[in-house]
């Protein structure tokens, strides 16, 4: 196929992905953007964001289902309803299989197609952050050795992203702030290390505050919103809430979608 022909096909895929997003058909959005990602050329910012939004919604729905099922399972166990617990476990396993497949799917694309063709510092940070995120999602439901391995890979992804961000992106850049937000949640939830989580979140917040006057108009809304989420988590983590009081209120970067318009918010 000629270059112009393949460009036209790519434009068609991107348009179909946008259409799928508007129709909230995220599984189809992901399938379409996977075709673009496998072309083996660097994605544009728009293409990168479409791929990210599609996967965030596809994985987000299953993560929510898993949390609900786990909560119901605990309640049924406490009541001693063994037959119900057995049913829930089987259903939860189905969701876990879906979660694992989605994570492995995007992680393969990141390793084989996205990172090797990333030429900008921004893209490199973006993809390593995604790697950290999707291994973190695996660590949320895996157990024992598999959980340990997922957590180790998540840490490697976040560390690689952080190293690149520290030299390539200003402290106020929304992608760098989103990385700090999700990395701090990783320390809090997966590594059970609230001190590390608070230190990371506070450092990112303080560094961004110090450079706030350099913030560009185009990223002001995104950056200040993520800074607010960092501060919300710091407040939550450092307060004397009862042990069962705060988990559901922890903010990750996906929380932006609840506060800003999902259709036009810049995804990071």
Swiss-Prot record:
Its main location: nucleus. The modification Phosphoserine is found at residues 70, 193. InterPro entries: 14-3-3, 14-3-3_CS, 14-3-3_dom_sf, 14-3-3_domain. Expressed in flowers. Residues 248-261 have a biased composition (Basic and acidic residues). Residues 240-268 are annotated as: Disordered. The modification Phosphothreonine is found at residue 214. PROSITE patterns: 1433_1, 1433_2. It comes from the Eukaryota. It is found in: Nucleus; Cytoplasm. Keywords: Cytoplasm, Nucleus, Phosphoprotein. GO terms for cellular component: cytoplasm; nucleus. Belongs to the 14-3-3 family. Is associated with a DNA binding complex that binds to the G box, a well-characterized cis-acting DNA regulatory element found in plant genes. This is 14-3-3-like protein GF14 iota. It comes from Arabidopsis thaliana (Mouse-ear cress). The lineage of its organism: Eukaryota, Viridiplantae, Streptophyta, Embryophyta, Tracheophyta.
């Amino acid at each position: 196929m000629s270059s112009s022909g393949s460009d036209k096909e790519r434009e068609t895929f991107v348009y179909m992905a946008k259409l799928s997003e508007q129709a909230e058909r995220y599984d189809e959005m992901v399938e379409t953007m996977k075709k673009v990602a496998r072309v083996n050329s660097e994605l544009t910012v728009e293409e990168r964001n479409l791929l990210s939004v599609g996967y965030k919604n596809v994985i987000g729905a299953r993560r929510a289902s898993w949390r609900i099922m786990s909560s119901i399972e605990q309640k049924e166990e406490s009541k001693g309803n063994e037959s119900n617990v057995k049913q829930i476990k089987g259903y939860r396993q189905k969701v876990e299989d879906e979660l694992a497949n989605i994570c492995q799917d995007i992680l393969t694309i990141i390793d084989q197609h996205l990172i090797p063709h990333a030429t900008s510092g921004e893209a490199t940070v973006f993809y390593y952050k995604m790697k950290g995120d999707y291994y973190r999602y695996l660590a949320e439901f895996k157990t024992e050795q598999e959980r340990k391995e997922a957590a180790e890979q998540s840490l490697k992804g976040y560390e690689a992203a952080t190293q690149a961000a520290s030299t390539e992106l200003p402290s106020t850049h929304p992608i760098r702030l989103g990385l700090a937000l999700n990395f701090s949640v990783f320390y809090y939830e997966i590594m059970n290390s609230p001190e590390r989580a608070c230190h990371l979140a506070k450092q990112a917040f303080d560094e961004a505050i110090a450079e706030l006057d350099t913030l560009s108009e185009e990223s002001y809304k995104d950056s200040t919103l993520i800074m607010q989420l960092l501060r919300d988590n710091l407040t939550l983590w450092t307060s004397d809430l009862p042990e069962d009081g705060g988990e559901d209120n922890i903010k990750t970067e996906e929380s932006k979608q609840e506060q800003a318009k999902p259709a036009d918010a810049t995804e990071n």
